[in-house]
């Protein structure tokens, strides 16, 4: 009723004024949506202690007072933001050693250049041994300018540098494009069998594990590459070590760029965590470290064969390694304490390869030698759940070593290669002296079942780890070198041989690849670059 009264009593309205002229508004671009908030940081992996497997494992942590063992000890998912291959098998997962992709489908291998090394004493001489993988880096400009040893190469924006440790006891520096030396070789005093590692932050900091005590105390030597000065020495002869008679470092360590820590295993049986306390000034051309050291020491029931020859694998706060007695362990790096162990049954020198699956499961691939079990026996190829240590499958292969005239071990020395892309369903193993004392095998297994998909029989045994290469269309290939000096390019889906090239000398080392050029050393005092075309 109230609404009706208001309508009746309202004064009649005047006619409305004419509408104002339209206002022309220039079109405005559609506002950009606000970027999503940054993803929360990756959390550490919390694993309960497996009391069943660790029941009789004696372990202790021997640490300098200043070593921080805290939640910050998480490896980033990306090892380096710079271009290159910085450590054995590329990073913490130890999954591959290639940076970049090929262009077109490859069908040819050719030698681009070769460099001759010096020689040490017999029987090591020169060239490269096992594992002997180089690092390859395209230096950030500010870092390149901070290294006077590069000379005129400091101004070369296109420089990609190969850094190769050698059995001659030196580290060699080579221009990937030309094969010419970029700076003087760096003498370490003892033969280098393993693979050097470079600071993934791009800092000119090089870690060199020595393999043979020829001229001076053996251990891990750390060099700054500004003036080629040794800034730290970790002696392999460690009074805390369970194995006192051998102090080699064939293992290639990992540097956590978020925490300034370096983790490495020694053949003396200790696992080391070094808080580096790095102080680098690229303008003043100075780099110093003042490491504080934590040592993880353990004793596993029935295993007196100490020594870590493989390169530690890691994912976030978890690290994985095996020893000369076949004890595999998962270590929480925040506390340097074990979470589980697995007894493989024999010496395990091959580095453990990790894989993060599409459904966020962490898997571990490993294989044993035929060593402590006798000259003839079985090598075991395995897939484990990396969070529990439980095997998901295992496959055995018969191999033949020898006891006389000298002891020769058989089995697997090469790191397993989990396939990616079009071969993401496959994992590749290289077998040495299997089935006979001179033979080798490359075998592709189904990741889910362990079933054999293909195999390639080799006329010679092999210790070298293959590299997976991918072309622009996503097709996958394997590059592999063996005893006898033959480098093979295989179609990864079938094992079909596409190309070969013959090098001088036996190949014990593993290659690194940058783009379509691989670098690989031999025992004939040579370092080669091989083009994959």
Enumerate the predicted regions with their spans:
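C-terminal motif of bacterial Sec signal peptides marking the signal peptidase cleavage site
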Residues: 6-8
